[in-house]
Design a protein with these regions (language model features):
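Catalytic alpha-helical scaffold of carbohydrate-active enzymes acting on polysaccharides/glycoconjugates
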Residues: 1-132, 137-185, 211-233, 241-290
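Surface-exposed cleft-lining segments at the edges of enzyme active sites
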Residues: 130, 196-209, 236-238
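Glycine-rich, positively charged active-site loop/lid region within alpha/beta enzyme cores that binds
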Residues: 181-203
């Protein structure tokens, strides 16, 4: 599989781009209004920015690892001081909708409205203009790539099509987005988010053992490292940022840090590097109907 291995900066062997979705209490229950009748759901989500985020930022500082946080603008608006700490401590902010809207259900005009609203809030609240996007809900519509390009986005971390970054071309012939695919195998919801009181997600399995989760995640990294690829996570502070789970993350980061030749990078650094290495592939595609 050597032909699949990208060239990483400074002859590094593999890449790790830690990414967290700071959803807070946004999502379906907020969008349909039911969250306001279920305080337990709200507090389950608000734990992320209110309590877990600071713990995760301290952990990242201990291991000297940068990260990217995809933040719904409503969360930045509601917890500005907590979200400002992300920027102050040297990490990246990416777009993640306003209230975690399902982009795949929205017309392009509505997607543009959400991107513009999010850009204004994040600039005013945090002083940043993100260049990255992770789609809320895990999918998007055929028009989304062009919507993102119009909004000044340079990369996405939304799709699942490779173990390396790749290029996404839109319909309008503009330069492509870099896609930095996250890995469902390292989505903490799959292992750590099933619980009761409230029963969410309803009817699903109980929480996995922490030792088994650490073993799974370690094997995922080891496979990426062996083949010289890129590991991008789908972690959620409200899920993984609790005291017992921080120990799990610390053990995982310690294992990754102990390996030689791992480039730990913010997602925008990965995207910029990938575009520089694949400039020929990044040229606009001519439209045959023009």
């Amino acid at each position: 599989m050597a032909e699949l291995a990208p060239r990483w900066p400074d002859a590094q062997h593999a890449c790790v781009a830690l990414a967290f979705d700071l959803d807070g209490p946004t999502g379906d229950a907020m969008l349909n209004g039911s969250i306001w009748r279920k305080p337990a759901y709200f507090t389950l989500g608000s734990y992320g920015p209110w309590r877990a985020l600071g713990r995760l930022l301290d952990m990242l500082a201990t291991f000297d690892v940068p990260a990217t946080f995809f933040v719904p603008a409503w969360v930045a608006q509601t917890w500005p001081a907590q979200c400002a700490a992300i920027v102050e401590r040297g990490h990246e902010i990416g777009y993640h909708g306003y209230r975690h809207e399902a982009f795949w259900t929205l017309e392009p005009a509505r997607q543009r409205e959400i991107m513009a609203q999010s850009a204004e809030i994040l600039a005013r609240t945090l002083g940043v203009r993100p260049v990255g996007f992770r789609t809320p809900s895990g999918d998007w519509s055929a028009a989304t790539v062009d919507v993102l390009r119009e909004a000044g986005v340079r990369y996405s971390s939304s799709m699942r099509g490779d173990d390396r970054p790749y290029l996404l071309h839109g319909e309008n012939g503009e330069p492509p987005l870099v896609e930095i695919p996250g890995r469902w195998e390292t989505d903490d919801y799959a292992s750590l988010a099933y619980h009761r009181n409230p029963d969410y997600p309803a009817g699903l399995d109980r929480i996995a053992g922490y030792a088994a989760t650490l073993d799974n995640w370690t094997r995922e990294f080891d496979g990426v490292y062996r083949e010289g690829l890129c590991l991008t996570t789908l972690l959620h502070p409200k899920v993984c940022g609790k005291p017992g789970r921080i120990a799990l993350l610390e053990a995982w980061l310690g294992h990754m840090r102990a390996q030689d030749g791992v480039w730990f990078a913010r997602c925008h650094q990965v995207a910029d590097w990938w575009l520089a290495q694949h400039a020929r592939d990044a040229q606009p595609i001519p439209r045959s109907d023009r």
